[in-house]
Amino acid sequence: MAQRFYDTRTAQIRDFEPLVPGEASVYYCGATVQGMPHVGHVRSAIVFDILIRWLEATGLRVTSVRNVTDIDDKILDRSAASHEAGFEASDLYPAREPWWALAYRFEKAFDAAYLALGVRRPTYEPRATGHVPEMFALIERLMERGHAYPAQDGSGDVYFDVRSWERYGELTRQRVEDMQDAPDADPRGKRDPHDFALWKGAKPGEPATAVWESPWGAGRPGWHLECSAMSTKYLGAEFDIHGGGLDLRFPHHENELAQSAAAGDGFARFWLHNGLVTYGGEKMSKSVGNTISPEEMLGMARPTAVRYFLGQAHYRSQLDYRPGALDEAEAVVERIEGFTARARAAGAVPPAPDGALADRVPAAFRTAMEDDLNVPQALAALHEAVRAGNSALAGQDLDAAAARLAEVEAMTAVLGLDDVPEGDDAAAGPVSDALDSLVRSQIEARAQARADKDWATADRIRDALAAAGVVVEDGADGATWRLAD
């Protein structure tokens, strides 16, 4: 059977034929790095990691892009709050933290979470702040085509004119009249309350480091514009797959599609959206207290079991967490690992790998993955192979056990279950990287405070690091750090 995916834009499961034979291009939305990653972020990353692994398993050469939104209202607001009198500083949110240091620190926290769960790095991981010229070019194309205009209030904002694009709403199948107003700027400068910001003029009190000069005045890019500019830079004007969480369909992806198509780009041929994570059947909410973080999950189960849990549902389905769910995932992973260990100990030797990875999995597994990435059915094939392998071992049929071992190892490779750091490897990798990134961000904030002659803040950062057992040593080439003896 041909590879098929559910395309959000057409609301149909369609045959997938890559734009370029033998290759595939995938863009999926990364994080706005304003805080620590939550399980929804990590589930989405695992979903698209499995997608990319499967496409590669079929023999395609995949170019993947996952962006980092490192300039945004939420990032600036959180940084601004840390400079206010009475701000209650903490280890997670220190006082007087520059916006760029905050964004970098949390970007590294996301990296650590991804690496801890075996999510491979994409081919490209561009930051929004590094692609402002590309955003200028996209705005200019939209203006030339009559789809964008400067704000009418002199604010320096630039808006996309939704009424000028008759296909606006095609991704989510909504009429403009039924949509919520765009909340991203003061509506007084808009022609229509649904128009959304492509460029946001600088506001009084905003840091100079968060402002770029543009043909329309100083300011910064809008969120939706960033993804359109970065995806097409690395993948071209038309590419195969655009992915992200279900919560991004509107307004983010709707606006991305509109501005890109209106600028003349073919843009994404397929739109894939993964379902959200709930807790006991309810939406996670800090106010209700029914949340769990990736860090907490990793404290309750091994990384491989956490990855299994977050990747086990159909990607379009809601994934529900409940107490005991990770214990169940741990037991399943142990059964898989138990079979592979017993098979090798018994002398079962799988045949040498030959051909594409997708050719070495059972037919039922391949059929499931080709059917809109049906991971639950693929896992059923994996568990059947484990059961058959255990039966072969019990009957001392090493040839059959070896054949099943080869299938199991091929399937776990596709699902990324064989690529999760465990034990000392896990501790030495993502955790140490995260610690280094966190400490360096504080050292950079201290250096900025010293440059500003803000000695109180510089001393406060130094003392906080010392209290945590970190020794900062100033040298001619800058500051370095080490753990206290």
Swiss-Prot record:
Motif ('KMSKS' region): 283-287
UniProt EC number: 6.1.1.16
UniProt feature, compositional bias: Basic and acidic residues: 185-197
Region (Disordered): 174-198
Gene Ontology biological-process entries: cysteinyl-tRNA aminoacylation
Domain of life: Bacteria
GO cellular component terms listed in the entry, alphabetical order: cytosol
A single GO molecular function term of this UniProt record: zinc ion binding
Cofactor(s) it depends on: Zn(2+)
Cofactor note as given: Binds 1 zinc ion per subunit.
Subcellular locations according to the entry: Cytoplasm
Name assigned to this protein: Cysteine--tRNA ligase
Gene designation per UniProt: cysS
